[in-house]
Amino acid sequence: MNISSMLSSDNNVSLKESMTTATDQQQQQQAESVDHASINGNGQTSVSAVNNVQENHLSEFHSSNQQHSSIPPVGTTVEHATTTTTTATNHQPVNSSPLKHSVDENSNPTTISSLKKDTNSIIASILPESYQFDNSYTPTIDQKYKSVFESNINVINQLDQYQQMGHHLKLMKFDEVKLNNYLINTGQFASNYIDRVVAEDISSRNNKISETNKNKELIAIDYSKPLHHNSTRGKEFKWGSTRKIHKVEHKSRRRKPAATTSTTDDSNKAVAAAANGTKDHSATAGTTASANGSDTPDRRHQRQSSKPSTPILIKPKTEPGKGSPEIQPRRSSRPKVKRKAFEDELETADKQSSTQQVKKSQESTGRDHKRVKIENKQEEQQQHQQQQQADEEDEAEAEAEAEQKPKSGALSEAAAAGMTAKEFKAFMRQYDNTYIAIWKDLSRKDGPKGSRSMQQATQGRLINLRKTALLAAREAKRWQLKNTKNQKDLTTKARRAMREMFNFWKRNERLERDLKKKHEKELLDKAKKEEEEREAKRQSRKLNFLITQTELYSHFIGKKIKTDELEGTNADDNLKSNTKEHLDKYADVDGSATHDINAVDFDNDDEEALRRMAAQNAQNALIEVQNKAKQFDNSEESFKNPDTNGEEMNFQNPTLLGDITIPQPNMLKCTLKEYQLKGLNWLANLYEQGINGILADEMGLGKTVQSISVLAYLAETYNMWGPFLVVTPASTLHNWQQEITKFVPEFKVLPYWGNAKDRKILRKFWDRKSLRYDKDSPFHVLVTSYQLIVADIAYFQKMKWQYMILDEAQAIKSSSSSRWKSLLNLTCRNRLLLTGTPIQNSMQELWALLHFIMPSIFDSHDEFSDWFAKDIESHAQSNTSLDEQQLRRLHMILKPFMLRRIKKNVQSELGDKVEIDVYCDLTTRQKKLYQQLRSQISMSDTDLLELESNSTSSDSSLANLVMQFRKVCNHPDLFERADVNSPFSFGKFAETGSFLRETNELDVNYSTENIVQYDLPRLIYDELLTPNYNKSIRDSIYSKFSIYNPENMNATGWLQGINVSPNELKHYSQMDILSRAIEMQNKPTETEKLERINYLYEGDYIPKNKKLLITDHSTSTNSSFISNSLVFSDLVSIKEKVGEDMYLNKLEPAVTPIASAPPITVNCSSMNFTNKMNNTLFDSNIRSSLIPLSLSTELKLMKDQIPLEQYPKSNMLPMPIFDYSNIRMPSMDRFIAESGKLAKLDELLIDLKRGGHRILIYFQMTRMMQIFEEYLAYKSYKYIRLDGSTTIESRREMVQAWQTNPEIFIFMLSTRAGGLGLNLTSADTVIFYDSDWNPTIDSQAMDRAHRIGQTKQVKVFRLVTRNTIEQKILERAKEKEEIQKLVVGNM
């Protein structure tokens, strides 16, 4: 359906009204245009002009409809903005305004007035409100401006109309597409269903059609059209086929319509012509063919196709001259299909009429739209009436033909056949007979076959009907499911669309929100970055201010105490020149004004002003320190110095002292070295200025004696004898007591240690009333440990100490520890820290020491870290660039408070120290244990060390894990010791009631018995011929049948070769095997006995049996050579003999027996059995032969001059290859070989022992010290051991024994317990079995030997297991050592 027709037929009332208004206005414009354009000079209208105007307006209307396809809405007027027309005479354009039409003088006055009113209203809307418009007065307005204004107004209105029309078109287009889709879907379902039903009809009717008619009808089928457009007779339909099936189209025969049915109206004639199948679309043309009732070509073709063909008749021979009778066409019994054809024609007519109606509506635009609809309904009613009339005419025609046929049937048939009536009757009779015969034959033969065929056809039809019903039900169900699914799909799609729309807007909102947040964040980041830059700049200036203040403070102090001069050659040359140039100019600033750090404007003040304020703060801080010391001293009356001869010396004022040089105090009973005397001067100046300090000389340079000397200086110069407090580690308490007593005997030392009761007694000697002690005070110096001072801090805080010395000050390196806080709260005038390693792990430790001595200057660790710590620590760890200027400033700050000298600069006579790293490999057992531990963790050794170093005390699992790795590297026996292996003993052991009842020698011979026992009957033992005790029958039988009896022997010459007589052979044969072996063992020959006797007794020995001889007893003269070879044979081969007895026979058994047991016990009641057992087990000859001969027995035999050959046999039991017992102790050789470190240390100790060195060996684990003690016992090395469990008294004794007894080869020490405060210069070799986390602890430990008094070169060996965690620990220790070298190594 065309869109224009839809618009013309379906618009609402408002649209129709607007169309009417538009049409009227257009006609009015046409009339006006005609009036203007077609009036010539004579006042007549030109017809051509009228036609032209009409055609122009009509074409414009059609073009506007085609472009917009819509009618303007109500209230708008379709007008031409500017209409240009020409007259026939002058052809001048005339502008006609839609607001005010161009009219002539004869126009209607009412129209002119209305137009004037409209014009006035428009002008009134334009003019201002103040302007009063008078209707009676027509203002003068420019016509050109007015026409342009009116045209613009019309263009705007027209654009609004076009926009609204376009919107309506879009809505109609959407509805059209939707309806078309619905029609297509519905038509598809209907077409499928009709095709299936028609196919079933075709298959059922094929069985009823004759062969002739079947072929004709099949030929007549039009296969180019759908199946339902043909007749129901067609091709057979195969079920399940997807091809299209067409039906033959049968057009209905219809009588021509009567002339009276035609109307005079042009529209009715067009509808009738369309219904009759004409193709004439003109409304004005006549329909003569339809009116006269003539057939159209389609109707003629239909009539010709509906005539039956002439049947073939069987007739007799006739004359050729006669004509054939008329043959009537045979009618088909099938009813005609009229309704279907009528519906098709009606549909075609409807389409044509609708098309013509649209055209008419376009042409007759001036008519009312309602009238068009009424005419369409009338046309439809007329068409329906014409169709009914045509059906009635066809039925009447058929009845008339039926009535005429019986009347003229016979004559027409006979005449048609060319026969007479008689002949025709005969022919018909013959024909009937033949026809009957045929039918009889058919009924007899073909009847049953036909019946069967009908049954089969019926059955097949029923089957097809069932299939059709099933398919129809299935199709209906499918259609229903599809409709249901479509409905569900619509709901689902609607929900999905809603969800997607919701997600879209939500995502859109989120995106907008994110963009907004991003923009805001960018603004905030920008502002934050600018603020950070300003704050960083401000903090930089603030830090520079603080550093400058500290520099100036250090500079002012350094000028007073002259640290550079005291350091000597160890000073930094770069600092000397730079210091005086830029800091001396601030020496004269006024220190009375103090500037608060929070009140300083770092953003606006210049650098010079900030430096001057920093100088003022530094000067003020120095004055405060001096005033504090002065206040401490003035709290009690000042003492007079006896050496000043009555002149008062106010030592509280350091400015009065001037630059003095302090000599060595006379009270000090030793001679200070040059660098030590400089240290004394530095300490004395610090005290006089009221400033605390750090004496950081390298270990072994005498920090103890320097600190004792400053105490002696105060006592001797200012009569200040205390109270002095010395806090030291527990291992050096006795050392301090001995050193003070030794160097200053006049000092009374109070050793404050022991249990709580002892310390309570010692506190009675404290004099809390006196601020300063004199020479007669109960004590002068109190020596205690860090642990005890923390425990009794409440008592120490009540005292005011003149001087406090902290030895090994790295013990207070943690500013968060209770030890550091307790010592900081003590009241004392001056503090002195002694440490050889001010930095051990990080810069935080250095800050803790600096804050302890100067809390007012070094008050913030964060600031100190920002100044120096981050840069220096990052350089040491990752080798980054280092700011040399920053490092110089740090050295300048530390110089006044810290004095540090190293050994190579101040002690030339001290021997060198050589450090050697000895790398060891893991053994097989160690590798397995190490791999097992590594498999249980997923981090590397480096990461493990990072976590362990950063972990707190609560993270004990990491420290434990690292300790397990280190235990594997030391020795695998730290996990599991080797057990003693012994077999299972299957027997009974003897028991005793009490050892007190036994004698000194407890005889336990044969005390172990086997659990298995058996009884031997007495008769069997006595009556059987067994070797038993005193049996005459056995002897007689043996004597008769023994081959060793001389009576039974004939050939005895072979006995001379073995030096045995026949009687001796008989004697040996009667002995048991053990007695025989003892008898034959070492039987000397005559020559050997003679030579042995002569050599041992030098010819003086004469046996008793030789004294009865008349002749002298003489020896052989040719025995010198024999004596050398026989007598000294054992002495010459003594080395080989010892090797065979001690080493070759000591083999490690490959297999240890699982169980062992004594012989099975035999019980017998025979006396012979008992005697035999006693003789065997307790034979004195056998026992004396197996065990060595006692010295007393041998001496008695010599005195009785018994011949050697008559000496009882002894010590004949040979050395076993294995031990006598199956109990296996762990092998010490294997114990050494299972540890790579211990095996390497064993080789090293052998060389050191051979070279005469004395060794200090440091361990980290006490269990490893116990294992090493077993090794030393096995090697028979002499040693002593010192660890944390050693008491203070034992420490002193051990150190003294080591220094005085050179036979002690090894001194075993724990690194933490024995690495501090000990003087062990007797050792020249130091070995670290395992290294400490802190490199300074190892440095202090090795300096126990490398210190003053050492004259030999000291070698330090460090055992490190390769490719293990120990190597990582050593690398980390070197990083920490690098930090110390950077900060204090070059000061």
UniProtKB/Swiss-Prot annotation:
Annotated Polar residues bias: 1-24, 90-113
All residue ranges annotated as the DBINO domain in the record: 438-563
One of the record's GO cellular component terms: Ino80 complex
One GO-annotated biological process of the protein: positive regulation of transcription by RNA polymerase II
Main localisation: nucleus
Catalytic reaction annotation: ATP + H2O = ADP + phosphate + H(+)
Location within or outside the cell: Nucleus
Domain of life: Eukaryota
CDD domains listed in its UniProt record: SF2_C_SNF
Amino acid composition bias (Basic and acidic residues), ranges on this chain: 360-382
Annotated binding of ATP, by residue: 697-704
Residues covered by the Helicase ATP-binding domain: 684-856
Motif DEAQ box, residue numbers: 807-810
Coiled-coil region list: 480-551
Biased composition (Acidic residues): 390-401
Ranges annotated as biased composition (Basic residues): 241-257
The record's note on its domains: The DBINO region is involved in binding to DNA.
Function noted in UniProt: ATPase component of the INO80 complex which remodels chromatin by shifting nucleosomes and is involved in DNA repair.
Summary of subunit composition and partner proteins: Component of the INO80 chromatin-remodeling complex.
Record-given protein name: Chromatin-remodeling ATPase INO80
Natural source organism: Candida albicans (strain SC5314 / ATCC MYA-2876) (Yeast)
Primary gene name: INO80
